[in-house]
Structure formats: structure tokens, C-alpha cells
């Protein structure tokens, strides 16, 4: 905990103090640590805190120990992601695990995570949004939310236990920075994976794939020959609809099992999911997978009133969750729900997101041409994006300090929709006189975030939980698209003067409460903390206060 070393997780400081010197609960220890880090509480702070340690206005500090379940996907650079439980394989319960991993912060910029904490088993809760996005963590895990603070839409950290239905959580949706084209073999395996998950099967003795799009079918067969090779059979037959169905049949699956597609062997439709190797692949590889997947079981259609829908259907709940999450990694917002027939659907239901899907991902065959035609046939202003910043319009109209003519323009126009800001942002800002209001509006509408409405916070059982230590100013990282947070601390140089030469027989030591270690009776304290920072207390009915001295 020395000031010349990196910050340590607050929970670790509390745990060591409680284990060695104070076996009476952790709350009082953490409260003391927080107070010693607050410059408004102590004239000379003794703890150098990193993260949320409260505010002079009595905003509470973040919790010392808050963590996520092991299945939470941590965003990495170049479109890669990893389960937080896989960051340090074999990590023991209640352990700190050093390492170096680049993760993305709340803005989508790369920062270093140098430690994984396995925090043991704790009661967890699942936060789910109206679109179906979800994250699971301990009750005191903080995520970034959009809060109406005295009429001002403000980004604030909220604990899961504080989040209620109709609150708004922040999802990071900046498209990934890509490092170049995909490795050809990885891309071919991703193409085969998407095709076989959607339109194929693989048992212990046989595998197959079929599709009516001849060009798409030929691409899958070519990928199979390049990655797997060996004897396979192709055929055609006319089905009831009159379409020609192209079929690939594989009788010997031993070579196929030897590839990364072997995870599909014997998998039931309801059990399908995205394998971990694909999550850890860069965006270019994931794009090939999604193109093949949507070309198989995906669809696009023009709907009444100049609207459009892109959808994917599956029998697997987990696959639907995975597809929605992977779309979010490309910045595409979708909605997930269970259809009446028992299938799970992932749908994109507005023009802006359909256009983003078409440019960032797209279908892998003839369906892409159909999507392009539908989008091209829509009137210029049809199907505007419904994504908005809750409370922004009312805030601007109330605090813009503009002339009457500009106020009237702001009142008549829809100024909380992100599509409006993308198109007319400069004009909206020109009609806002207050520079602070302009700054807040610009920050909330730059497109990095999606503000998702919470529908439920439910118990998810006792599970192993994990956290990361991130070396950045706000110590934030992305999990399932949600923005997560942490706190850490270390001693200040001034506090070291209270401990200086403590190991050179300057003070007496006695056994601690259980006799395992020694503890000092007093501190050497070259820095007179009692006088400099003051103190207060009450005993035998009398209050005593020592004011701080310079």
C-alpha cells in the first residue's frame, strides 16, 4: 500500500486490516479508509484514493467490493472480448491475480487492467433492460446510469441495489477500431461456424448443410474444402416452395471434429451458443460469422408505414443473447424477445440501426441485396431512429437562456432524438445560448452511449464473482456493454511519515487478537496527525473535539 506502488483494491486493504487487527466487521474499516481519502474531511489526507470516494455534498462512496459473474464479457481492443472469469484461468477463490490485459474504458479507448480479483461466492442480481440486455453482479456493483438530477440529465454511478425499473443504464456502443483484414483461416472457420449453426447439423457420425442461395452455398463448400478437406457430397433437389435446395453431406466427421467447429458435435438446437474462441477473435472475424449466420436464419422485410425490420430466429436462448451482444459490439442496437411459437428472436426495428447493420455487418449473400433495395426505397425522413436522451429536451428548453425566437424553435422541434442531433446538431447548438447547457448536450449526444430503460432487477443466486483493476482516471471498463467501475487506494507520502522506522524498534509490539501476528501499541508518527487533522469523540457523557491545526 506504499505511495510509490500502484493502487490496491479497497476490499484487499479492508480484508487484511480485519483479518489481522479488527475482527468485528468491515463497515467501520472501510468508512475510515474513505474518510482518510477525502480532502474535505481531513486537512491532510492520509489515503490516496482512486475511484469514487464520495463528494462534499454527501454523495456516498462506491462500495469497496463489487463484482460481476464470470460470464460477463469484457470488451478488449479491435473488437475482441473475453469472459471475466477466463482472464486468469485457475484463479483461486478470494485471490488477487496479476497480469497485463488491455481493455476498453467507458469511451471505447484502450487502458491497462493489471489485476483480476476472484472475490469468492456472493449473492448476485441480474439487471435487464427493455431491449433484453443484461448484466449480473453483486448488489453493490456500480454501473453508469443516466439520472435526472434536479432537472439535469447527468451520468452517475449507481449500485445495482439502487437501480429500479424505469431507470436508465448506459450502454457503450462505439463501433470497434479494426486492425486490418481477418486472417483467412480464422475467417473461413467463422464462415463455417455461422453457416452450420444456422442451416447445418453435426452428429457423431454425420454432418450437413443446406441453403437455397447458390452463391452462399458455394462459399460455404469452398470454406469447408479449405479448412477441413476430405470427401464430401453435394446435391440439389426441388422443395415444396419450388426453390432449389443445395445440400452438402459429410459422412466422415473425424476431420471436422479436429477443427474449432468440433464444439458443434452433437449439439441440440436449443443448446447452441457462440464459442469462446470466436468471442476472443477480432471484429473482422466476428463480422464474417454474423454475415453467415444472418444469411442462414436471418431475414429482412419492409413493413407498413415506411419501416423496416432485420431479424434472426433461434431455438436457443443463449445464442439469442450472444447474437444481440455481438451486434452491440458493432454499435447496432437490437431487441431480444421470445416469440409465441417458442423461438427467440433478435430484431432491429428502425431505419438507422438497419442502415448501421447493413454497413457494419450485412448479410452474407442475396439477402444483402434485398436489404439494400428496401433501405433505398424508403423516403429520406422515414423510420427515424427512436433512440433518445431521456430528459434532454426538457432540460434544454428550461435552461437554454436563449432569445424568444430560439426558445420557440427549440420548443417546436424534437431535440432529444439522436438522429436529429446527427443531422441538425450544429443548428440545435446555435440556438442554445447557455454554454454549460451546450456542453452537457454535446456530451450526451455524441453517439458513444445508448440509454437503455431497465425493466427488472432480479435475484440470480449465489455465484463466483470477479473484478478487474484498471489503470485509468475513472477506473471504468465495459462488461456486456454496461460501464462498470471500481475503487482502489494507497497511502499518501504524508501517511508514510506516521509509519516511518516502525520496524526499527521505535515502538513496542504486542500479539494481535488471535496471537498470529504482532501489532504496534502506538505509531511512531513523525507527522502529528491528531493535531494536524483534528479529531472528536464522546466518552463518559462528555464530548471532546480537537480542531485541526496548521
UniProtKB/Swiss-Prot annotation:
<keyword id="KW-0238">DNA-binding</keyword>
<dbReference type="InterPro" id="IPR004860">
    <property type="entry name" value="LAGLIDADG_dom"/>
</dbReference>
<comment type="subunit">
    <text>Heterotetramer, composed of two GyrA and two GyrB chains. In the heterotetramer, GyrA contains the active site tyrosine that forms a transient covalent intermediate with DNA, while GyrB binds cofactors and catalyzes ATP hydrolysis.</text>
</comment>
<feature type="domain" description="Topo IIA-type catalytic">
    <location>
        <begin position="1"/>
        <end position="550"/>
    </location>
</feature>
<dbReference type="InterPro" id="IPR006141">
    <property type="entry name" value="Intein_N"/>
</dbReference>
<dbReference type="GO" id="GO:0034335">
    <property type="term" value="F:DNA negative supercoiling activity"/>
</dbReference>
<dbReference type="InterPro" id="IPR036844">
    <property type="entry name" value="Hint_dom_sf"/>
</dbReference>
<dbReference type="InterPro" id="IPR003586">
    <property type="entry name" value="Hint_dom_C"/>
</dbReference>
<dbReference type="InterPro" id="IPR006142">
    <property type="entry name" value="INTEIN"/>
</dbReference>
<dbReference type="Pfam" id="PF00521">
    <property type="entry name" value="DNA_topoisoIV"/>
</dbReference>
<comment type="function">
    <text>A type II topoisomerase that negatively supercoils closed circular double-stranded (ds) DNA in an ATP-dependent manner to modulate DNA topology and maintain chromosomes in an underwound state. Negative supercoiling favors strand separation, and DNA replication, transcription, recombination and repair, all of which involve strand separation. Also able to catalyze the interconversion of other topological isomers of dsDNA rings, including catenanes and knotted rings. Type II topoisomerases break and join 2 DNA strands simultaneously in an ATP-dependent manner.</text>
</comment>
<feature type="active site" description="O-(5'-phospho-DNA)-tyrosine intermediate">
    <location>
        <position position="66"/>
    </location>
</feature>
<dbReference type="InterPro" id="IPR004042">
    <property type="entry name" value="Intein_endonuc_central"/>
</dbReference>
<dbReference type="InterPro" id="IPR003587">
    <property type="entry name" value="Hint_dom_N"/>
</dbReference>
<keyword id="KW-0547">Nucleotide-binding</keyword>
<dbReference type="InterPro" id="IPR013760">
    <property type="entry name" value="Topo_IIA-like_dom_sf"/>
</dbReference>
<dbReference type="InterPro" id="IPR002205">
    <property type="entry name" value="Topo_IIA_dom_A"/>
</dbReference>
<keyword id="KW-0067">ATP-binding</keyword>
<dbReference type="GO" id="GO:0003677">
    <property type="term" value="F:DNA binding"/>
</dbReference>
<feature type="domain" description="DOD-type homing endonuclease">
    <location>
        <begin position="192"/>
        <end position="332"/>
    </location>
</feature>
<keyword id="KW-0413">Isomerase</keyword>
<keyword id="KW-0651">Protein splicing</keyword>
<dbReference type="GO" id="GO:0004519">
    <property type="term" value="F:endonuclease activity"/>
</dbReference>
<keyword id="KW-0963">Cytoplasm</keyword>
<keyword id="KW-0068">Autocatalytic cleavage</keyword>
<dbReference type="InterPro" id="IPR050220">
    <property type="entry name" value="Type_II_DNA_Topoisomerases"/>
</dbReference>
<dbReference type="GO" id="GO:0009330">
    <property type="term" value="C:DNA topoisomerase type II (double strand cut, ATP-hydrolyzing) complex"/>
</dbReference>
<dbReference type="GO" id="GO:0005524">
    <property type="term" value="F:ATP binding"/>
</dbReference>
<dbReference type="GO" id="GO:0006265">
    <property type="term" value="P:DNA topological change"/>
</dbReference>
<dbReference type="GO" id="GO:0005737">
    <property type="term" value="C:cytoplasm"/>
</dbReference>
<dbReference type="InterPro" id="IPR013758">
    <property type="entry name" value="Topo_IIA_A/C_ab"/>
</dbReference>
<dbReference type="InterPro" id="IPR030934">
    <property type="entry name" value="Intein_C"/>
</dbReference>
<protein>
    <recommendedName>
        <fullName>DNA gyrase subunit A</fullName>
        <ecNumber>5.6.2.2</ecNumber>
    </recommendedName>
</protein>
<keyword id="KW-0799">Topoisomerase</keyword>
<dbReference type="GO" id="GO:0016539">
    <property type="term" value="P:intein-mediated protein splicing"/>
</dbReference>
<comment type="similarity">
    <text>Belongs to the type II topoisomerase GyrA/ParC subunit family.</text>
</comment>
<dbReference type="Pfam" id="PF14528">
    <property type="entry name" value="LAGLIDADG_3"/>
</dbReference>
<dbReference type="InterPro" id="IPR027434">
    <property type="entry name" value="Homing_endonucl"/>
</dbReference>
Amino acid at each position: 500500500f506504499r505511495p510509490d506502488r500502484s493502487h490496491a483494491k479497497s476490499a484487499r486493504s479492508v480484508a487484511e486490516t480485519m483479518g489481522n487487527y479488527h475482527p468485528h466487521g468491515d463497515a467501520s474499516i472501510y468508512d475510515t479508509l474513505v474518510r482518510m481519502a477525502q480532502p474535505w474531511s481531513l486537512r491532510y489526507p492520509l489515503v490516496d484514493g482512486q475511484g469514487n470516494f464520495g463528494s462534499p455534498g454527501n454523495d456516498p462512496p462506491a462500495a469497496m467490493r463489487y463484482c460481476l459473474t464470470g460470464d460477463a464479457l469484457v470488451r478488449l481492443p479491435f473488437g475482441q472480448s473475453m469472459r471475466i472469469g477466463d482472464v486468469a484461468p485457475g484463479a483461486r477463490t478470494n485471490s488477487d491475480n496479476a497480469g497485463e490485459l488491455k481493455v476498453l474504458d467507458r469511451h471505447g479507448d484502450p487502458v491497462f487492467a493489471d489485476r483480476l480479483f476472484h472475490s469468492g461466492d456472493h449473492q448476485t442480481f441480474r439487471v435487464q433492460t427493455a431491449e433484453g440486455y443484461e448484466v449480473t453482479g453483486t448488489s453493490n456493483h456500480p454501473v453508469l446510469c443516466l439520472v435526472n438530477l434536479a432537472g439535469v440529465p447527468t451520468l452517475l454511478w449507481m449500485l445495482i441495489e439502487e437501480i429500479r425499473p424505469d431507470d436508465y443504464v448506459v450502454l457503450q456502443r462505439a463501433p470497434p477500431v479494426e486492425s486490418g483484414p481477418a486472417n483467412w483461416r480464422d475467417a473461413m472457420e467463422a464462415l463455417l461456424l455461422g453457416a452450420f449453426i444456422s442451416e447445418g447439423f453435426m452428429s457423431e457420425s454425420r454432418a450437413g448443410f443446406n441453403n437455397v442461395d447458390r452463391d452462399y452455398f458455394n462459399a460455404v463448400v469452398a470454406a469447408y474444402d479449405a479448412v477441413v478437406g476430405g470427401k464430401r457430397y453435394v446435391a440439389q433437389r426441388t422443395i415444396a416452395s419450388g426453390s432449389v435446395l443445395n445440400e452438402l453431406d459429410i459422412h466422415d466427421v473425424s476431420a471436422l471434429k479436429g477443427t474449432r467447429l468440433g464444439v458443434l458435435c452433437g449439439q441440440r438446437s436449443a443448446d447452441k451458443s457462440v464459442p469462446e474462441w470466436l468471442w476472443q477473435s477480432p471484429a473482422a472475424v466476428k463480422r464474417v460469422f454474423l454475415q453467415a449466420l444472418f444469411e442462414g436464419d436471418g431475414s429482412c422485410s419492409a413493413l407498413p408505414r415506411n419501416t423496416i425490420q432485420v431479424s434472426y430466429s433461434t431455438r436457443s436462448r443463449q445464442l439469442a443473447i450472444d447474437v444481440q451482444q455481438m451486434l452491440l459490439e458493432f454499435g447496432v442496437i437490437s431487441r431480444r424477445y421470445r416469440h409465441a411459437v417458442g423461438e427467440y428472436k433478435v430484431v432491429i426495428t428502425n431505419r438507422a440501426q438497419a442502415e448501421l447493420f447493413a454497413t457494419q455487418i450485412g448479410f452474407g449473400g442475396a439477402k444483402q441485396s434485398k436489404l439494400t433495395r428496401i433501405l433505398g426505397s424508403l423516403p429520406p425522413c422515414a423510420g427515424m431512429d427512436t433512440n433518445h436522451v431521456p430528459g434532454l429536451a426538457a432540460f434544454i428548453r428550461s435552461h437554454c437562456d436563449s432569445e424568444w425566437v430560439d426558445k420557440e424553435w427549440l420548443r417546436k422541434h424534437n431535440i432529444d432524438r439522436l438522429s436529429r442531433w446527427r443531422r441538425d446538431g450544429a443548428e440545435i447548438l446555435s440556438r442554445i445560448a447557455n454554454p454549460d447547457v451546450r456542453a452537457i448536450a454535446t456530451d450526451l449526444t455524441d453517439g458513444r452511449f445508448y440509454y437503455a430503460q431497465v425493466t427488472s432487477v432480479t435475484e440470480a443466486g449465489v455465484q463466483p464473482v470477479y473484478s478487474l483493476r484498471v489503470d485509468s482516471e475513472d477506473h471504468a471498463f465495459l462488461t456486456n456493454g454496461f460501464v462498470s467501475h471500481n475503487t482502489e487506494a494507497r497511502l499518501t507520502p504524508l501517511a508514510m511519515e506516521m509509519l516511518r522506522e516502525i520496524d526499527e524498534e521505535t515502538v513496542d509490539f504486542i500479539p494481535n487478537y488471535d496471537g498470529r501476528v504482532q501489532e504496534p501499541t502506538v505509531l511512531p508518527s513523525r507527522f502529528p496527525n491528531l493535531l494536524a487533522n483534528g479529531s472528536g469523540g464522546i466518552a463518559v457523557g462528555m464530548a471532546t473535539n480537537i480542531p485541526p491545526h496548521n
